[in-house]
């Protein structure tokens, strides 16, 4: 990509929000993933619902969904969008790793990649916040876009 291809800059080389007025509305979907590593006791207590602050996964799920809907308030050049679906799921390895996956969908003029990435990031931060008293060494890693569909650029799938 050439420097001139960057769309978030105006002629004065200052930031701008991209004009999507003439773009067609299409179904757009994005899936993102993040992993949080923790000690075995922390994961076991999360899964057993034994964290003093409450149901960690339920709170993280709601936080991730809320984050997807509020992305344009956090990321300056993101367009406000009408989210038609936001879902968060969790998968653990039974030891020290919890994987968070988000799926965000809209019918609109711009994609939802940032919404999906924001959702998993905030869900992971919520888990950290709720468990930091017992495990300050948790690590949030491997946050990435898994897949996106729709729009002019078509389908993207991350390499496995």
From Swiss-Prot:
Gene Ontology molecular function, alphabetical: cyclic pyranopterin monophosphate synthase activity
Keyword Lyase: yes
Active site: 129
Catalytic activity from the UniProt record: (8S)-3',8-cyclo-7,8-dihydroguanosine 5'-triphosphate = cyclic pyranopterin phosphate + diphosphate
BP term (GO), one: Mo-molybdopterin cofactor biosynthetic process
Metabolic or biological pathway, per its Swiss-Prot or TrEMBL entry: Cofactor biosynthesis; molybdopterin biosynthesis
Keywords for the protein's UniProt record, in alphabetical order: Lyase, Molybdenum cofactor biosynthesis
Keyword rRNA-binding on entry: no
UniProt-listed Enzyme Commission number(s): 4.6.1.17
Binding site for substrate: 77-79, 114-115
InterPro entries: MoaC, MoaC_bact/euk, MoaC_sf, MoCo_biosynth_MoaA/MoaC, Mopterin_CF_biosynth-C_dom
Family, per entry: Belongs to the MoaC family.
Record note on quaternary structure: Homohexamer; trimer of dimers.
Biological role: Catalyzes the conversion of (8S)-3',8-cyclo-7,8-dihydroguanosine 5'-triphosphate to cyclic pyranopterin monophosphate (cPMP).
Annotated protein name in UniProt: Cyclic pyranopterin monophosphate synthase
Source organism per UniProt: Listeria monocytogenes serotype 4a (strain HCC23)
Gene transcribed to yield this protein: moaC
